[in-house]
């Protein structure tokens, strides 16, 4: 009964947060996995980001994200492969990636060289 509204809420929130942030292009590895190229990276305390995460928890789509969360949240992220350096947004290292990269938490700027 609530699945459709939950999906609509998540999609609307992701659409609202989608904005490209120019950054250096790179292809490397983080200690937590591959470097992610995210359309948007914002601090978890931003009201719209916090509301998105609370909504995901409320509908049972993720658990325990908000309580212990620190740092930044990446929106619409894709891993950057070693054979590619096609990131025209922000390159970050993230601790956990959810929903095939649509939400990534614990993100920090990738401290890497341009290849």
UniProtKB/Swiss-Prot annotation:
Disulfide bonds: 30-93, 37-87, 38-77, 94-107
Chief location bin: secreted
GO cellular component, one term: fungal-type cell wall
Keyword Disulfide bond: yes
Secretion signal, residue range per the UniProt entry: 1-20
Keyword Disulfide bond: yes
Subcellular location: Secreted; Secreted, Cell wall
Keywords in alphabetical order: Cell wall, Disulfide bond, Secreted, Signal
InterPro entries: Hydrophobin
GO molecular function: structural constituent of cell wall
Xref: CDD domains: hydrophobin_I
Subunit structure: Self-assembles to form functional amyloid fibrils called rodlets. Self-assembly into fibrillar rodlets occurs spontaneously at hydrophobic:hydrophilic interfaces and the rodlets further associate laterally to form amphipathic monolayers.
Protein function: Aerial growth, conidiation, and dispersal of filamentous fungi in the environment rely upon a capability of their secreting small amphipathic proteins called hydrophobins (HPBs) with low sequence identity. Class I can self-assemble into an outermost layer of rodlet bundles on aerial cell surfaces, conferring cellular hydrophobicity that supports fungal growth, development and dispersal; whereas Class II form highly ordered films at water-air interfaces through intermolecular interactions but contribute nothing to the rodlet structure.
Family: Belongs to the fungal hydrophobin family.
Protein name: Class I hydrophobin 21
């Amino acid at each position: 009964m609530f699945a459709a509204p939950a999906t609509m809420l998540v999609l609307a929130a992701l659409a609202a947060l989608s904005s490209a942030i120019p950054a250096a292009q790179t292809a490397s590895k983080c200690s937590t996995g591959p470097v992610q190229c995210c359309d948007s990276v914002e601090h978890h305390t931003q009201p719209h980001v916090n509301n998105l995460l609370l909504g995901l928890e409320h509908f049972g789509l993720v658990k325990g994200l908000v309580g212990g969360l620190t740092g930044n949240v990446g929106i619409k992220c894709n891993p950057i492969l070693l054979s590619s350096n096609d990131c025209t947004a922000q390159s970050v290292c993230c601790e956990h990636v959810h929903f095939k990269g649509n939400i990534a938490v614990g993100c920090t700027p990738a401290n890497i060289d341009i290849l």
